């Protein structure tokens, strides 16, 4: 036995090497004694360690066997026989001779499998609780000595539950595992930091003594105020959650700011590249002047513009209202599917009143400014011609004729459009089409064709355009109602101002009677307050007209421009249906002339069919391009108009608040000085 494996085992456990039977008896006796003295052995650890160290120094296997001469039975046969019989009886009672696991001990082909070190059966011990002598694993053991496995059990089992050793081994294994775990954690794991807990710790309130706080506040009062303001601004701009940034998603604050500026300046859905920006442009419309005699009287406005796009960097010209309408139609013809800033509506009655002229001047200036802010429209040839031409009357007619826009003397509604055949088919083919009366000339030939054949009709297939057009009609109707309500409010406010003025004059008349000097002074001051209120009402009425009224009017006219681009798509769709109808007719005629392929009539008919096919392809291409352009423009238009409407509401609200504050101050001053 190796005493280093089990230091607490009895010293005499392995001294008897005479036979297996005696050894089994002694081991069983030791087991019973060990169970009785377990508690004493736990308490006396120092004695056991001393015994273990003593056992290590002495070789028990080579020690001579001690014999008592008085008790020796070697020379007495009776005592020796009696002693042997007693020992046999005791061994047979405690350990039968038949060993059920003898075959396992003596067989060279069978072995006992023990549990691996991962799941110990008893108290975490990895070794088998049944330990046999060395003959089990002796390769020279004879197979004849093996017995049947099914026989009765015999042998010399050792102590099954060695609690002291198990505890010592378990503690040692646990400490080794703990050391390995900590070592692996130190080498593999990295320290984890919770961003939310870190933010809470940064914002955590730390109590400080009042004296120190007062001293800091007195010494650094300016710095403290600045830091508080900075912290408030940072908290306002700070996101709700601080998400950790990873790898490619990390961007510097400068890049974020640059991207936000690009997003804000670039219209949503616009096909203009984000890097392209509008060139700086200054436009001003001022100095309206009445020109002409009774039959040709009109108002001319001075248009001043400054930009690097102009040939001379500066231009000053005079333009009338119809010139602004010409510009609108030309831009509409040059840029299909794009929302063009509209001019004011044509109005014949009251066109020479002062308020009307000022309102129209403001609207035309707003139109030019919006065109200048668009990077595409500001570079248009017709727009630059409008700003710089000194002989605009003749040059505008030439441009309208060359482009086929029909912009001269236009008096139609802003939502009505005209599709230029020159812009659609090209100059050569358009000349032939116009010579024959237009694209839809075939559908209007003669009275009989109108009576007995149905005209081709275009039906919109895309739900987007149907839905958006319906919403635009509803929005336009509601805005017109709101504009009328605003006019009623303005009229009522002007009526209130007139009534206030009349009341003030009556109070002044009453004060002129001079019943008493204090009374007259009080009444005169009272009348002055009402005059000031009357002036405030007139100013607020004018302010609301110039903000909400102009904004609503511009919104309604812009919706007319949006309806115009929808009508452009419908017009192109109508031309597409007409050309397709003509193609079908020509195709049927070619089918009838199929037998006369070499005839002159067949060749002429086939040439006409090829021309119609080319027109059909061009029209379909333009129809699809306009549809895509409208979808992009509509989203950007909605965003811009929402922003403009909100700004107009804010300005109107601020003006109303200032007007009410002025009235309150007037009444407070009157009360403090006179009452």
Curated annotation (Swiss-Prot):
Pfam family membership, one? PX
Q: Which SMART domains match?
A: PX (SM00312)
A GO BP annotation: protein retention in Golgi apparatus
Region annotated Disordered, chain positions: 1-26, 65-84, 165-219
Q: How is it modified after translation?
A: Phosphorylated on serine residue(s).
**A GO CC term assigned to this protein in UniProt:** cytosol
- Residues in PX domain copies: 279-394
Family of the protein in this entry = Belongs to the sorting nexin family.
Q: Which gene encodes it?
A: VPS5
Misc. comment: Present with 6120 molecules/cell in log phase SD medium.
Domain comment (free text)? The PX domain binds phosphatidylinositol 3-phosphate which is necessary for peripheral membrane localization.
Q: What is this protein called?
A: Vacuolar protein sorting-associated protein 5
Basic and acidic residues bias locations: 195-204
PANTHER family recorded for this chain?
Answer: FI18122P1 (PTHR10555:SF170), SORTING NEXIN (PTHR10555)
Instruction: Give the classification, highest ranks.
Output: Eukaryota, Fungi, Dikarya, Ascomycota, Saccharomycotina
Q: Which UniProt keywords apply?
A: Cytoplasm, Endosome, Golgi apparatus, Membrane, Phosphoprotein, Protein transport, Transport
Q: Which residues bind a 1,2-diacyl-sn-glycero-3-phospho-(1D-myo-inositol-3-phosphate)?
A: 320, 346, 360
**What is known about what this protein does?**
Plays a role in vesicular protein sorting. Required for retention of late Golgi membrane proteins and vacuolar biogenesis. Component of the membrane-associated retromer complex which is essential in endosome-to-Golgi retrograde transport. The VPS5-VPS17 subcomplex may assemble onto the membrane to promote vesicle formation.
Q: What is its main location?
A: cytoplasm
Q: How does this chain assemble?
A: Component of the retromer complex which consists of VPS29, VPS26, VPS35, VPS5 and VPS17. Component of a retromer subcomplex consisting of VPSD5 and VPS17.
Compositional bias per record (Basic residues), positions renumbered to this chain: 168-180
**Where does it live in the cell?**
Cytoplasm; Golgi apparatus membrane; Endosome membrane
The record describes its membrane topology as: Peripheral membrane protein
């Amino acid at each position: 036995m190796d005493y280093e494996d089990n230091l607490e085992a009895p010293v005499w456990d392995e001294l008897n090497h005479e036979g297996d039977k005696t050894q089994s008896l002694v081991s069983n006796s030791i087991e019973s004694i060990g169970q009785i003295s377990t508690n004493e052995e736990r308490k006396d650890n120092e004695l056991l360690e001393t015994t273990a160290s003593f056992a290590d120094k002495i070789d028990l296997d080579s020690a001579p066997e001690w014999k008592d001469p008085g008790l020796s039975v070697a020379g007495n046969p009776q005592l020796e026989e009696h002693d042997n019989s007693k020992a046999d009886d005791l061994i047979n009672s405690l350990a039968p001779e038949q060993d059920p696991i003898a075959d396992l001990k003596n067989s060279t082909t069978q072995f006992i499998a023990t549990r691996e070190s991962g799941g110990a059966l008893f108290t975490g011990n990895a070794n088998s609780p049944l330990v046999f002598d060395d003959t089990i694993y002796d390769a020279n053991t004879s197979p004849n000595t093996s017995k049947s496995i099914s026989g009765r059990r015999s042998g010399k089992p050792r102590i099954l539950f060695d609690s002291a050793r198990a505890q010592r081994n378990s503690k040692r294994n646990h400490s080794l595992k703990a050391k390995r775990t900590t070592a692996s954690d130190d080498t593999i794991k990295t320290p984890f930091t919770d961003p939310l807990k870190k933010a809470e710790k940064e914002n955590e309130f730390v109590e400080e003594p009042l004296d120190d706080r007062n001293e800091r506040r007195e010494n650094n009062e300016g710095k403290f105020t600045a830091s508080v303001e900075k912290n408030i601004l940072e908290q306002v701009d700070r996101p709700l959650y601080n998400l950790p940034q990873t790898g490619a998603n990390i961007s510097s604050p400068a890049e974020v700011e640059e991207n936000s500026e690009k997003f804000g300046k670039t219209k949503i859905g616009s096909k203009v590249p984000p890097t392209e920006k509008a060139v700086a442009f200054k436009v001003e419309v001022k100095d309206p002047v009445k020109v002409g005699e009774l039959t040709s009287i009109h108002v001319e406005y001075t248009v001043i513009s400054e930009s690097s796009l102009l040939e001379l960097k500066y231009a000053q010209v005079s333009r009338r209202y119809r010139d602004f309408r010409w510009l609108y139609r030309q831009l509409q013809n040059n840029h299909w599917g794009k929302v063009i800033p509209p001019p004011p509506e044509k109005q014949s009655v009251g066109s020479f009143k002062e308020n009307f002229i000022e309102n129209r001047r403001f609207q035309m200036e707003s139109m030019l400014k919006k065109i200048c802010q668009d990077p595409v429209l500001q570079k248009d040839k017709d727009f630059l011609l409008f700003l710089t031409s000194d002989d605009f009357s003749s040059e505008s007619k030439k441009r309208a004729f060359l482009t086929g826009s029909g912009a001269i003397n236009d008096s139609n509604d802003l939502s009505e459009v005209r599709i230029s055949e020159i812009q659609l088919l090209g100059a050569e083919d358009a000349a032939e089409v116009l010579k024959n009366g237009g694209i839809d000339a075939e559908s209007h030939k003669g009275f009989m064709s109108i009576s007995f054949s149905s005209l081709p009709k275009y039906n919109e297939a895309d739900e987007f355009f149907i839905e958006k057009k319906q919403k635009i009609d509803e929005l336009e109707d509601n805005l017109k109602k709101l504009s009328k309500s605003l006019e009623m409010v303005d009229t009522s406010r002007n009526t209130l101002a007139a009534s206030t003025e009349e009341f003030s004059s009556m109070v002044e008349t009453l004060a002129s009677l001079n019943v008493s000097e204090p009374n007259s002074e009080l009444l005169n001051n009272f009348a002055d307050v009402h005059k000031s209120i009357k002036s405030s009402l007139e100013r607020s009425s004018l302010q609301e007209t110039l903000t909400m009224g102009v904004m609503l009017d511009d919104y309604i006219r812009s919706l007319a421009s949006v309806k115009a681009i929808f009508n452009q798509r419908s017009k192109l769709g109508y031309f597409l249906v007409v050309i397709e109808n003509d193609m079908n007719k020509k195709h049927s005629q070619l089918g009838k002339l199929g037998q006369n392929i070499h005839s002159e009539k067949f060749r002429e008919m086939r040439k006409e069919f090829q021309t119609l096919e080319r027109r059909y392809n061009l029209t379909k291409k333009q129809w699809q391009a306009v549809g895509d352009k409208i979808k992009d423009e509509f989203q950007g238009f909605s965003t811009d108009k929402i922003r403009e409407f909100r700004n107009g509401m804010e300005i109107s609200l601020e003006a109303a608040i200032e007007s009410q504050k002025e009235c309150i101050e007037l009444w407070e001053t009157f009360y403090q000085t006179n009452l």
